[in-house]
A protein has these predicted regions:
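Conserved catalytic core of two-metal-ion nucleotidyltransferases
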Residues: 25-88, 108, 115-191, 196-214
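Catalytic metal-binding acidic patch
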Residues: 1-22, 174
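A short secondary-structure junction signal
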Residues: 91-96
Length: 214
């Protein structure tokens, strides 16, 4: 079941699968859901996870003061979709584009909070991420694509491809969900080697949600 103090569930996939996923959603997503991403709506902020799949007729306000939802047709409950891409194992190759996006990030936040939509900066930001993935295509290292800048560029989330693929399926509630092939190795990088250590009791509470209406 859900961990009470980590009150959300995420999806992650490689960019090559993400492109096919968008096509599938356009064709097959049930009417009671919608999806939001920069690829289909230039109001979407690419600093947040690559996509949100939302349920219509619901409402959720996040703990997030700087990155408001500009796709105002739906503020429903959602699942985040994170985009992964191929990465370089070399710091020399890895850092330039990663640092460039780190520098662009605060300007996107600034203009967004001034009520302006910096589409040029967003396109530049996203294209840097796509270029980086293309340059490293086929690498045995993968990780969050370069649009995820809320991590030190000196210690990015980078995983061994073989620690994630092929995925394995495990029971969760009443279904089977895919997880990393080597979950321990994945979680040591994505969370911390101490991921099995309980947080202090005062921190064992939901952290993502301000208000929710179902």
């Amino acid at each position: 079941g859900f961990i009470p103090w980590d009150d959300d569930a995420d999806i992650a996939m490689l960019y090559e699968d993400y492109k096919r996923f968008i096509v599938a959603l356009k064709q097959d997503l049930p009417q009671e859901y919608t999806f939001q991403c920069f690829d289909t709506d230039k109001r979407y902020n690419p600093l947040i996870p690559g996509m949100k799949i939302r349920k219509k007729g619901t409402y959720l306000k996040e703990v997030n003061t700087l990155l408001a939802n500009r796709c105002t047709e739906c503020d429903g409950i959602f699942i985040d979709v994170f985009v992964y891409d191929y990465c370089s194992a070399s710091k020399t190759m890895d850092l330039p584009l990663r640092m460039l996006n780190q520098l662009i990030m605060p300007f996107i936040i600034l203009f967004d909070n001034l009520g302006m939509n910096p589409v040029f900066l967003k396109r530049w930001f996203v294209s840097n991420a796509r270029m980086y993935g293309k340059l490293n295509e086929g690498s045995k290292k993968i990780g969050f694509d370069l649009t995820w800048t809320f991590k030190s560029p000196l210690k990015p989330f980078i995983f061994d491809y073989d620690d994630i693929y092929p995925v394995q399926y495990v029971p969760f509630e009443d279904t089977q969900l895919p997880i990393a092939h080597h979950p321990h190795e994945y979680l040591c990088t994505a969370i911390a080697p101490s991921y099995m250590t309980l947080p202090p009791e005062e921190e064992q509470k939901p952290k993502h949600i301000v208000d929710i209406r179902l």
